[in-house]
Structures are given as structure tokens and as C-alpha cells.
Amino acid sequence: MEYFRPIPCETGRWRLAGGWARFSQFELLQRGVAPRVVDAAPEALLQTLTAPRPEVLGLSMAQPRIMGIVNATPDSFSDGGSYDGAAQGRRLAAAGAEILDVGGESTRPGAREVPEADEITRVVPVIASLRGLAAISVDTRKAGVARAAIAAGAGLVNDVSGFDFDPGLAQVVAESGLPVCLMHAQGIPETMQDDPSYGDVLLDVYDALAARIARAEAAGIPRARIVIDPGIGFGKTQAHNLAILRRISLYHGLGCAVLLGVSRKRFIGSIGGAEVAADRSAGTLAVTLAGVAQGIQIHRVHDAEETRQGLALWRAVTGGDK
């Protein structure tokens, strides 16, 4: 099978996904074959690559958006177990986060499942208290949690399992009429980092996301309401993460807005020499801006102020807002 990755270029002929990034050429990718640059791709794919993406939560996808991470959990990898979700969400919104992603179950490597009732108890009060400050998404794998979160004011469901964990979640999303983010993960948090393996991680994740989209569409969720996330750090080694990030523009070929979540991830600490998760904001921003250069629309981060500032300077220097 052939895959065509748009190669971002400042003076490119076409706009990527109707946004700020441009391209004129493609990298032709095939399993077991060396990549090569080509000047043409199938017309249907070109139309998909250039079509503007639908708004998400009322936000245009023609510019990068900041999603702030709100941990309503006592065991998140990044905050050392100290949390106040409502206060955290207010700080993120004030700092420039346009979406607040509220989660009540840690999905860090090795984390154990949280009972549904406990997860609901954690997220619903936080969502209710943040309603009106920014758009709200709920980070959950469970249908019951999503239903309660939607009733409290969540406008998007962010499922790290891509409907693998709870098949009933697809029906909840379909009936709600809300958008959903489908992430790729190999395995579950308890075991996903034990020994992840792929034939070709970039292409395997592409195919897996395509299958998740097809399953969502079959459940009654149109592609226009789907966001995709390649799942950096979820069942992937450092080498896997880097392989995806170097060519992440490939995923625009799936016809959905793309979300990138790299904030404070272990590979940033490993490469950047930052053992403590909270010390990884500079590395996070570097990877985030690399994703922006490849047209990635939504960036899920802990540090909204640093990201807002970085994006403002990126726009000023590159003309990325034109």
C-alpha cells in the first residue's frame, strides 16, 4: 500500500487542511521501501489534504489551538499527586487555554483503572465549575463517565482508547451529537510500555486510526466530528515516538483535525536531560512547535502560558497567521 505524506514548505502551492502550513510535494511511503519525494498524489487524497477542517468546539482549525490539561486525579505523572482541578482549570484558561481537558483517571504508564463511580465523582464537579471559562472536553474511556460529563457541560469526549476500552462509548457520543477525539494506544495503561512493537510504527498507527474512524462512522459519528491523536507515549518507545513526530503530517490524509499530546512526556526528559516532569516545559514547547510546523491543529499541554507565548512568537517570525 502507498501512503503520501505532504511535505510542509513555506512557499508551497497548497494549504494543508485549509490552515497555515503549505506544501507542494509528497513523500511516498511504503512498507519495506525507502521513502522518496514525488510531485503528485491521487486527486481524492489531495482534496482531503487541502480541505479545511470543520470547527471543533466552535474553534476554527485554521490556526493552532491550546488544550489545557486539567487533572482531577491524585496520581497524575506530571504533578506529583498534588491537584485541585477547578483551580488548575481557571489558571489554564486565564493563561490562554481555549479548551480544558478534564480527566479523572490517570493514563500514565502503569496506572490502574479507576472505578466508574469514582471517576464521575472526580470530573463532574470540576467540569461544572469551569463551564463558561473555556470549551470543555472530558478525558475518559467510559460511557457512563462521558454521559455524566456531557450533562455537566463537556462538549467533546477525548478517549485515549479510541473506543477499544468501552464499546458503549461510541453510542453515547453518537447520540450526543458532540465531537470525539480518538487516540491510538497499543495496550492499556497498566501494561502498554512493557514491550511495544510495530512493523512500521508510522504506517501501523495510520492504519489503526483509519480503522477507528471507520468504526466511529459505522456507529453514527460523521468524520466531521472526529479528531485523531497518534498517541505519543501510549504503547510506544522513544524511537517510535520520534518516528511519528518526524512525519506526523502524514495523518492529515485521514481527513480529520489532529491533536498532539507530548506535554512533559518521558522521552522529552530523556533527550532533554530533565528527570522531573515539571522541568520539561522547554522541551515540550520545542516539540509542540515542530508539530505546528507540520500543520497539527490542537496541542494538549500542561503549560498554557508558555505555549501561548511560543505560538505568538512563532506566528510573528514565520508569518504563520497569514
Ranges and model annotations:
Residues 62-66:
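A short, charged/proline- and glycine-enriched loop
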Residues 32-60:
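Non-catalytic propeptide/linker segments at domain boundaries
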Residues 222-225:
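Short acidic capping loops at alpha-helix termini that bridge into adjacent secondary structure
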Residues 1-20, 30, 61, 76-91, ...:
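Active-site-adjacent loop and "lid" segments of alpha/beta metabolic enzymes
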